[in-house]
């Protein structure tokens, strides 16, 4: 997607001055605060920039690198704000309140999901899920981890399982710069005044994602979880920039920002690396670096994908991009170009990137003929075949008319050699009313649901 309207969601816990409080920073380069944690908590180093008080029996002082560093080195805390991709304006509902996340060796604020099933994997040009290698279909519901009502989450997974949709993409980020009102879900707070970040692992934080992962395990659905948004919705790059300086184009190479970003990745991956519900980790939602050399995103993606694999070698990793910068079949139009800093084929060749992703929004890209999308899908399938990796048709949609040209894109995806498709986006009635929606939403049980989902699933099952 392009940029969505967003509602920042926050709430933070303050730290004491004499001792660092629960989840507070207690060490790191250029950190001048207390390195002693409150009783029952210990100081654990997450990276050279940031050590955090996590549950533990004793207080310890972290080791700090003596390498010279800038005087404005970051301190990390995590908050929430929303972000997605396309030019879609959507209403966003709130979630809950919480605390930062401990490392995988520390006690977790809520039980980690441990369900049955096996890890999804790439199998040639296809995906294998729970031992079955075939074409799969799924959807996007970015808003699901921000729901506070467990029954709403269960209902969504009930409907997905009934429909046979095996893959669901949800936001694994929600970055904020200001604490939201109580009862609003956020995952990471980037304090602009203190240049610190805090991870929220409380009931209105990552514990909501915990429930989503557990529900996915129960229903046999696999999740794709991106770590940051290119767009300002739900925080995005700008939430980091507001706290640490620089610009969106500098986000990829800013040492302080990347340290905070990697600390968040470690917190989330460590939480779910043993879960069979994770289909793949994504570096971000629609990464873009406008006007940059394609080397910027390529270098960043090479480094971060390797880092994720070092934390979790069992799950797949993808970039989460739109598929821009493709030479195969190029008509020199905007999406085929590299103005947004992406080179699809170069990025796909990164060793730790397991599959390619492509998105499709003709209206948002200034394409007047929807039939253009068929070639877009086919050309990416050719690029993936050349690379020997699967292609995921990860986001696609139209503003209305979901039962016309959109169905042709689905048929092209089935016949061209892509491995799966995820329609944008799923909607249904929740306890609070309609789920967050945009012009692309397809609501459960409607006529559009039948044509765009149920009829498509019949074709998928015949494939």
From Swiss-Prot:
Cellular localisation: Secreted
Chain spans, region Disordered: 57-78, 93-121
Disulfide cysteine pairs (residue numbers): none
Domain (CBM1): residue spans on this chain: 19-54
Active site: 286 (proton donor), 395 (nucleophile)
Reaction catalysis annotation: Random hydrolysis of (1->4)-beta-D-mannosidic linkages in mannans, galactomannans and glucomannans
Predominant cellular place of this UniProt entry's protein: secreted
Record text about domains: Has a modular structure: a carbohydrate-binding module (CBM) at the N-terminus, a linker rich in serines, and a C-terminal endo-1,4-mannanase catalytic module. The genes for catalytic modules and CBMs seem to have evolved separately and have been linked by gene fusion.
Protein name: Probable mannan endo-1,4-beta-mannosidase F
Lineage: Eukaryota, Fungi, Dikarya, Ascomycota, Pezizomycotina
């Amino acid at each position: 997607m392009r940029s969505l309207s967003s509602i920042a969601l926050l709430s933070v816990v303050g730290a004491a001055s004499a001792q660092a409080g629960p989840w507070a920073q207690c060490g790191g380069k250029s950190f001048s605060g207390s390195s002693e944690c409150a009783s029952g908590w210990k100081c654990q180093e997450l990276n050279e920039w940031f050590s955090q008080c996590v549950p533990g029996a004793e207080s310890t002082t972290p080791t700090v690198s003596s390498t010279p560093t800038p005087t404005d080195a970051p301190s990390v805390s995590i908050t929430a704000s929303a972000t997605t991709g396309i030019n879609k304006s959507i209403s966003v509902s709130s979630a809950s309140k919480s605390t930062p996340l401990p490392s995988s060796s520390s006690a977790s604020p809520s039980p980690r999901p441990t369900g049955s099933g096996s890890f999804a994997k790439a199998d040639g040009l296809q995906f294998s899920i729970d031992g079955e290698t075939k074409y799969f279909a799924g959807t996007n519901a970015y808003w699901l981890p921000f729901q506070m009502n467990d029954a709403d989450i269960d209902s969504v997974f009930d409907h997905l399982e009934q429909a046979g949709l095996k893959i669901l993409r949800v936001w694994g980020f929600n970055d904020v710069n200001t604490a939201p009102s109580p009862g609003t879900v956020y995952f990471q707070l980037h304090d602009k005044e203190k240049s610190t970040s805090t991870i929220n692992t409380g009931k209105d934080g990552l514990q909501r994602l915990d429930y989503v992962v557990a529900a996915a395990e129960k229903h046999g659905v696999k999740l794709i979880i991106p770590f940051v948004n290119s767009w300002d919705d739900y925080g995005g790059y700008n939430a980091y920039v507001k706290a640490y300086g620089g610009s969106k184009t500098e986000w990829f190479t800013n040492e302080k920002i990347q340290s905070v970003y990697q600390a968040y990745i470690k917190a989330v991956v460590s939480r779910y690396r043993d879960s069979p519900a994770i289909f793949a980790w994504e570096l971000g939602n629609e990464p873009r670096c406008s006007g940059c050399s394609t080397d910027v995103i390529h270098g960043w993606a090479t480094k971060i994908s390797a880092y994720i694999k070092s934390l979790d070698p069992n799950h797949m990793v993808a970039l989460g991009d739109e598929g821009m910068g493709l030479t195969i079949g190029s008509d020199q139009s905007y999406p085929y170009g590299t103005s947004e800093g992406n080179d699809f084929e170069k990025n796909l060749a990164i060793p730790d990137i397991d599959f390619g992703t492509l998105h499709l929004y003709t209206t948002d890209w200034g394409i007047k003929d929807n039939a253009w999308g068929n070639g877009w899908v086919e050309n990416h399938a050719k690029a993936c075949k050349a690379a020997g990796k699967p292609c995921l048709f990860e986001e696609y949609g139209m503003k209305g008319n979901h039962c016309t040209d959109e169905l042709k894109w689905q048929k092209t995806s089935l016949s061209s050699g892509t491995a799966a498709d995820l329609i944008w986006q799923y909607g249904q009635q929740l306890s609070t009313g309609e789920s967050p929606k945009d012009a692309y939403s397809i609501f459960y049980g409607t006529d559009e649901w039948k044509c765009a989902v149920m009829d498509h699933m019949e074709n998928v099952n015949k494939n």
